[in-house]
Amino acid sequence: MIRQTPYSKENEQKNNSEHSANRALPPSGEPEGASGASFISHSLSLPLQSVSAVLTLLNEGCTIPFISRYRKERTGGLDEVQITDISELYDRLKELGKRKETILKTIREQEKLTPELEARIHACMDSTELEDIYLPYKPKRRTRAQIAREQGLEPLALAIMEEAKKPTAPPDLPEGGGDKLASILQKYQGRAKESLSSRVHIGTPPLSGRSGGAPLPLSGESEGALALDIIAEIVSENQQARNTVRTAYQRGAVITSKVIKKMKDTDEAQKFADYFDFSEPLRRCNSHRLLAMRRGEDQGILRVSITIDSEECISRLTRQFVRGHGVCQTLVSQAVEDSFKRLINPSIENEFATLSKERADEEAIKVFTENLRQLLLSPPLGQKRVLALDPGFANGCKIACLDEQGNLLHHEIIYPHPPRNQVRQATEALQRMIRTYKIEAIAIGNGTASRESKEFVGNSLTPQPPLRRERGREALPSSPEGGRVPMRTREDKGTLNLSQHLSEVSASLSPPLSGRSGGASPIFLISEDGASIYSASPVAREEFPNEDVTTRGAISIGRRLMDPLAELVKIDPKSIGVGQYQHDVDQSKLKHSLDQTVMSCVNQVGVNLNTASLHLLTYVSGLGPALARNIIDYRREHGPFTSRAQLKKVKRLGDTAFQQCAGFLRIPDAKNPLDNSAVHPESYHIVEQMAKDLKCTIKDLIGNKKLLAEIDVKRYLTPQPPLRRERGSEASPNPSERRGGAPPNLPEKGGVPMRTREDKDALNLPQHLSEVSASLSPPLSGRSGGALGATLRDILTELEKPGRDPRGEVEVFEFDKNVHTLSDLIIGMELPGIVTNITNFGAFVDIGVHQDGLVHISQLSDRFVTDPTQVIRLHQHVRVRVVEVDMRRKRIALSMKNIKQ
C-alpha cells in the first residue's frame, strides 16, 4: 500500500501535493490507465508518455531488463531503476485499489455509503488518508462510546459538542455559567440528565485542571461520563484532528530508548550499550540506529518510545472543537484531552513506529541490494584451471582442483598448520597438484587460517627462501641471469597490475611453478560468506552427491573466483553477509528486492546458454524455474544449442518467452556470430543489411573498426511515431519489431562527415554516433519520438566489442606482511585493505587481522559524503590509516582521509 513517511519536510510537502492531485482509481481496483499513469508521472517526475509506455509493456508481460535494454524508443530511454520505480508504484496503486473496494463493500453493507463518501474514497491516493476516511465506519470491538450510544446518549454528546463550538464569554457571575448546559439537559429525560446534572454543579463554571480550576467529576460508568466517551471517540475519528497530531509528530517527535534495569549488566546487553539512555529527533534518526534500537527492544533489552509535546498538541486539538468559555466548552476540552491520551496519541505513535520502521527497512534493503549488486558484478577470473583451498588448522586445508568449466578434477586435505605442521608433505602435495592439473590460479578462502595459508602457498610456489624486508621493500630473488625483479613499494601493493606483476614474477623464478607456461599461479583471497550454507544445501547435494560438505565448500570458493555471479546465485543472498540488519527488515520486501537485483545482474552480464546452471537460467528475463528446467532437459537430450532459434523447440517456451529471453542468452560457438552478442534476434535484419551494404559477412563486420566506420547510420534509421495515443488509437508498433528487410532510408537532410580510411583505425564510436545524431532531423533520440537511435547505438556498440563483460578484470591483492593480529596495529600506520561491507554509516575493511575495521562515513573522503557508495565499492582495494584500536571490544577505527587511493 502507498504509505506516507511522516517525519520529513520533503515528504510532508510531497504528500500534500499528492493529496491535491485528487485523482481517482476506478471501482475495479485497477489503476485507470490515464489517471494511474498521470499519478505515477507526477509522483516520480517522469514524462507521462514514457510512464504510459512502460505500463503498457508491463501489462503485455515484458520484464524490466527487457524493457530497459530493448524498448528504449518506447520508454524515452528510461533506465532500469526508473522502470523499477514505475513498476513498484503501479503495484502499490493496485493494492490501494483493492483496499478501496474492500472499504466500499463494508460501508455499503452498513447502508451508510453516500455518493459524496464514495467519490471521496475514489479520489484518495494515500493509504493513511484512506484509513482515516474509513475509521468511523470500521467495525470495532465494543467500546465505551458504543456502550454510551446503546444507552441513547449520542444526541446529548452531539448537542454538547455543538454548543462548545459557539463563542461565549466567561460569565461575570459564578451562578450564570451553567445556563447553556441546563438548557441542553432539559431536552433529555431520565438517568442521563440526573447523572450529568448531579456531577456538574450548574451555576458554577467547572474548569478543567489545566485551566486552573477543579477537574470535572465525570468518571466511572455514569451516563455523563459515557457521553464524554462519545465525544472522545468522535474527536479521535476526526481526520483533521488526526492530521494535527501527525503534524506534531512530523515536526517534533523524539525517539527514546532506555535499558531495562534487570538486563543492564548482562553480556547480551553490551552490544546495545550506546542505546542504554539515548534520545534523538525521529526525523534525524538514521536507519541503522533505529533498527538497532528495535532489535534491542525485540530482545527484551531496551524500551523504545516515540514522544511529542503533549500539552501543545492537546491545546491545538482543543482549539479545533472549542470556542470561548463555558460549561460545555469545558466538558469538550476534557473529552479532547481524554481522546488524545487514550485514543489518538497511542494510535499515531504506533503509526509512526510502523512507518519509521518501514523507512528504515527500505534504507537497509537499499544498502543490501546495492552491496549485492556490486558483489554479483565482481570481476571474474574466467575459464581458467583453479586450485581452491578452504583453510583450517586442526581439520586441515581442504583442496579442490577444478577445470576450466568448474568441474571437479581432484580433491584432498593437507595439514601445513598447527597442530600437525606437516609443511614438507603439504608443500609436495600442493606442487604435485599444480603441475598435474595444470593449475593457472589459486583461490583461498578468507576465513580461519587464511593469512597463514596464503603465506604457505606463496612459499610453496617460490623455490627461493622466504622473502626478507629491506628498508620498506621486499628482498628480491635473483633471476637466472642474476638480475633483480623490481618489487613494488608499500604504496603500490593495493593496486597491482596482474599481467605485469605475473610477468615480473615469472621472469624471476627458476623455473616458474605453474601448470602452464606464462608465469606463476596468482593467489586470490575469496570471501567464504555463505559457502558453508551452500555446501549443506540441496543444490550442492544435487551437484556433488558423492562429496562431503568440506569438499563442496572448497569447490564453491574456486568457482566464486572463476565466475562470482554464476556461483553466488545458488546461495540465499541473506547468507552472503553484505547487508545491515537484514534479519530485522521486512523479509518479503527484502526477498523481492534481492530477487530483482539478481535478475538485473544476470541479464546485464548475459548467460552462456550451453553451460549455465539451472539457478542462473532461472533469473534470465522471461524464463523462471519451469522453463529453465526445460532448457536443461533439452540440452541434456539434444546436446549444446547451436543457435538462439533452437530455443523455440524447448517445451513451453513460446514466442513471448523467446522475445524476453533471447537477447540475454549467449552461444559462443553459434553458427550466427550475433547469437553470441547482446543484439536481439528482432534486430538481426539490420546487421545483415549493414553487412550486405558493405559487401562483407557479419563475422567480418563484428569487431572491425574500419568497416564499422564506413556505416552510414542514417540509412538504418526508422521514423518513430509519437508515443501519445490520440482518439483512442493504439500506439504504433515498435519499429524494432518490424520484420523482413532493412528499415526504409530517411531522405538526406545534410551530410554526415564520414571518416577516411586513415581515420578508421582510431574510430571513436560514441563520437561518431554523436556526429550522426547532430546531422539528423529529428535528432537521434528516443525522447524525441523520432528515429530508432537508441537501438542503433546499442547495436553498433555491441558490434564494436561483441560479448564484452561489464565486470572488469580481477586483481591480485596483498596484505601487509608485518600485520597479522590486533596487537600488531599501531595508531597512525597505513595499511592496504579490502572493502568487505558497505553500510549507510560507513564501510568495513579487512586489513588481515581477522577483524574488520570500520571507516566511518565521515572518514571516507576529504570531502563531505552523504552516500558511501558514491566513493567506495565492495571488494575495492584501498589504503587506510589506523585511528583507534579497542582491544577489549575488538573494534578498529580506520580512516581514508588524506590518503592517495
Question: Model-found features: residue ranges?
Answer:
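Long, highly charged, low-complexity intrinsically disordered interaction regions
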Residues: 36, 95-112, 119-122, 533, ...
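A glycine-rich phosphate-binding loop feature that marks nucleotide/adenosyl-phosphate handling sites
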Residues: 247-254, 389-393, 447-449, 526-533, ...
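Single-stranded RNA-binding regions, centering on S1/OB-family and related RNA-binding modules
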Residues: 675, 681, 686-717, 764-768, ...
